[in-house]
């Protein structure tokens, strides 16, 4: 514990104190930028907003800015520590808003325990922010503050301590009830705790379908019953006419326990008295009302959730507030109403039933994760939550009449994808175009779980027609283990193919003078990789992707044997598409040619440029060296110069030049001012390296240290689209390469 305390203190103190900062979003490098950012240029947007207030969303950060407001009277696990001491918590909230939903935050700690002061403070903030997240304000003040602000403000206000827990446990409840086979209108629910979160959650459950008279709340004084005279108006709504007076009595025969109180107040004996297949949400933090292993021992038939990350079914409010505000602000909602909260609950419940991406399982160190008793709600670090919850909330705002603008849900989802990273945006654009003409993609490693999951993604998106090659029973078994259906995914068994003899003869005719006998050809055709390559060779498929279980050379060699280089080409090479926040670059050759001569370098540049054209991007090719346009008379630089000369002669319309240093290539001002004769019109987007060592080092450094996403390797120069994965590729990497293979195949056929 002492080590954790010191670690936490060092985390907050190291470098710049605290956890957040304000960063400019516009250039600010010279006098011109100063005159635009501030006086006199700043007067122009001011005039526009004065004439038309909604223009603030166009010219300022208002539409992406949240105020996190507290007075520090009820900080989780710490109590009333005051506004200043609560500031680290509010800064942490700001990090979560930014990391999960790309929302900016001002954390504002109000120096008053008077709820009317907090209300007035928030009212005065309305011109500044797009929404207000109330945080760590004691009950019942929090109810009064939120109600008054909802009545008086025209921006969304949301008390996360109340509604976040309600929304997320609501999703868990819906899914748990499906698993135990109980109807929501028949269940008996007991709350251990009767604070803001418990009351808001109980109200949310009523809207989901739980009968109010079947909900029992217990506070520190026992059951909230009709005979008590110490209840505030919010607790009175749940005062039941029942005989039970304490938590053990209330839990007898109950179907659901929702713990929102303190550690250790629930015993195994209490759980033993609950109904069959109980649902237990023990949500006190950091230590729950009863530890999950203890609860499981008492009730093996129970479904259990906690607020902890080290047990299944973590109920974490980060699944709610970032995405709810994202959706609300993006349609300029005037409030967050019950329809929007309900939409968030149902979106989370539905997402938990979807197949879990490999990247999510890898983030949590899991090999398998599927809907069931140990997976009721999505994991907090599942990037799909943004794509499910925010659109659901936004559309609910539109449907309930509180939105200031209407959205196209599909377009909005694509905008959200872009917030998750430039690579997702780029690949989504390719996928969308392929849906009109999906290509048939062969996967020889058909029983590989990652390949199967990737095939499922491709089939669901409609961006390709995946074909798995291998033993059908093994593929079926692997799919079942991975929790993936094979619907709309074709399975081909090379060992029982009706056309095996024809394919064998085709391969034999190609390789008979390379030592291959007809008998050997017949044997190889039963191999999924050779079978797939021959299907591709004979135009029965559009592309092939392989390598998840193979070393790169072992996958490339058969491809060269069967498919070979494209007509007129002697060399194949490997490209990586490097995706940065603002730019996309293509690096070559990263995988094939160790020390290419001038002729080979020219071929690498030519085939790379062809591929980039097929993606719909105009290539601007820089031939890289340590020298700029003959500045160093050395053999290595001369090799690159000679390659450039060959390209200028053979492809005069191609934007290519060199030799040049890397900064000359990517900084257009260096190129245009110092080397105005260069054929490149602007910074290069295709970088051809002088050798494999430089290319391989560069792409890996940019990926690991520069934060670029590397998509590839993309094999170019082949007669047909064959692409070889890095061994151990994850689902996203397989999908990305398959999409690029499909684009390559479609565009190749079109020419």
Positions of PLM-derived features:
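A structured beta-alpha segment of the ubiquitous adenosine-cofactor-binding alpha/beta core
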Residues: 116, 178, 228-273, 511-536, ...
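NAD(P)-binding Rossmann-fold cofactor-contacting core
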Residues: 192, 208-235
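Adenosine-phosphate binding glycine-rich loop
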Residues: 160-161, 177-182, 186, 282-390, ...
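Anion-binding alpha/beta catalytic cores of soluble intermediary-metabolism enzymes, centered on
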Residues: 84, 136-183, 404-405, 415-751
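Conserved P-loop NTPase motor core
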Residues: 134, 205, 244, 260, ...
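Glycine-rich adenosine-cofactor-binding loop
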Residues: 65-77, 82, 166-170, 180-206
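N-terminal ligand-binding/catalytic initiation module
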Residues: 1-157, 351, 396-399, 403, ...
């Amino acid at each position: 514990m002492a080590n954790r305390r010191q670690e936490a203190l060092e985390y907050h103190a190291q470098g710049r104190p605290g956890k957040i900062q304000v960063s400019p979003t516009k250039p600010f490098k010279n006098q011109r930028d100063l005159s635009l950012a501030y006086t006199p240029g700043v007067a122009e947007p001011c005039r526009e907003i004065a004439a038309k207030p909604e223009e603030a969303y166009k010219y300022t950060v208002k539409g992406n800015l949240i105020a996190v407001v507290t007075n520090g009277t009820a900080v989780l696990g710490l109590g009333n520590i005051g506004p200043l001491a609560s500031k680290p918590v509010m800064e942490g909230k700001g990090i979560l808003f930014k990391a999960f939903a790309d929302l900016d935050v001002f954390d504002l700690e109000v120096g008053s325990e008077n709820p009317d002061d907090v209300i007035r403070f928030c009212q005065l903030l309305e011109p500044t922010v797009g929404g207000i997240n109330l945080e760590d304000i004691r009950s019942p003040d929090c109810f009064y503050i939120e109600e008054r602000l909802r009545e008086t403000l025209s921006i969304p206000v949301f008390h996360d301590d109340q509604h976040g827990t309600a929304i997320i446990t609501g999703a868990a409840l819906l899914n748990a009830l499906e698993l135990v086979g109980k109807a929501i209108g028949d269940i008996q629910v007991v709350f251990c705790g009767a604070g803001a979160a418990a009351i808001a959650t109980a109200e949310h459950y009523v809207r989901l379908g739980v009968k109010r008279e079947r909900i029992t709340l217990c506070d520190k004084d026992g059951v909230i019953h009709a005979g008590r005279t110490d209840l505030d108006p919010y607790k009175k709504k749940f005062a039941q006419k029942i005989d039970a007076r304490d938590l053990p009595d209330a839990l007898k025969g109950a179907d659901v326990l929702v713990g929102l109180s303190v550690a250790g107040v629930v015993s195994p004996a209490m759980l033993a008295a609950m109904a069959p297949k109980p649902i237990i949400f023990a949500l006190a933090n950091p230590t729950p009302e009863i530890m999950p292993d203890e609860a499981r021992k008492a009730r093996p038939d129970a479904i259990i959730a906690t607020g902890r990350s080290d047990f299944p079914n973590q109920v974490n409010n980060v699944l709610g507030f970032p995405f709810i505000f994202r959706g609300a602000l993006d349609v300029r909602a005037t409030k967050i109403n019950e329809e929007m909260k309900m939409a968030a609950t149902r979106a989370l419940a539905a997402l938990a039933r979807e197949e879990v991406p490999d990247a999510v399982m890898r983030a949590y160190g899991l090999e398998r994760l599927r809907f069931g008793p140990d997976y009721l709600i999505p994991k907090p670090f599942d990037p799909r939550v943004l794509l499910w919850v925010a659109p659901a909330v936004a559309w609910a705002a539109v449907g309930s009449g509180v939105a200031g603008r209407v959205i196209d849900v599909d377009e909005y989802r694509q905008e959200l994808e872009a917030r998750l990273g430039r690579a997702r945006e780029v690949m989504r654009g390719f996928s969308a175009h392929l849906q009109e003409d999906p290509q048939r993609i062969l996967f020889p490693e058909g029983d590989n779980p990652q390949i199967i999951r990737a095939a499922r993604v491709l089939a669901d998106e409609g961006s390709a027609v995946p074909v798995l090659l291998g033993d059908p029973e093994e593929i079926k078994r692997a799919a079942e283990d991975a929790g993936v259906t094979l619907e709309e995914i074709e399975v081909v068994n090379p060992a029982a193919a009706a056309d095996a003899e024809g394919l064998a003869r085709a391969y034999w005719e190609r390789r008979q003078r390379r030592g291959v006998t007809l008998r050997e050809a017949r044997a190889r055709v039963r191999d999924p990789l050779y079978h797939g390559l021959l299907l591709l060779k004979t135009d029965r498929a559009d592309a092939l992707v392989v390598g998840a279980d193979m070393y790169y050379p072992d996958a490339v060699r058969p491809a060269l044997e069967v498919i070979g280089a494209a007509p007129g080409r002697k060399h194949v090479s490997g490209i990586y598409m490097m995706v940065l926040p603002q730019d996309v670059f293509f690096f070559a050759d990263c995988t094939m040619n160790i020390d290419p001569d001038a002729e080979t370098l020219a071929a690498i540049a030519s085939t790379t440029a062809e591929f980039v054209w097929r993606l719909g991007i105009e290539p601007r090719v820089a031939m890289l060296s340590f020298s700029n346009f003959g500045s160093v008379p050395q053999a290595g630089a001369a090799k690159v110069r000679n390659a450039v000369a060959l390209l200028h002669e053979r492809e005069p319309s191609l934007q290519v030049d060199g030799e040049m240093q890397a900064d000359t290539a990517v900084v257009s001002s260096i190129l245009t001012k110092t080397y105005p004769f260069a054929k490149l019109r602007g910074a290069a987007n295709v970088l051809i390296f002088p050798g494999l060592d430089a290319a391989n080092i560069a792409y890996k450094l940019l990926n690991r240290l520069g934060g670029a996403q590397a998509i590839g390797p993309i094999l170019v120069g082949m007669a047909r689209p064959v692409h070889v994965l890095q061994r151990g590729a994850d689902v996203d990497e397989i999908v990305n390469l398959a999409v690029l293979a499909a684009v390559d195949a479609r565009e190749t056929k079109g020419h």
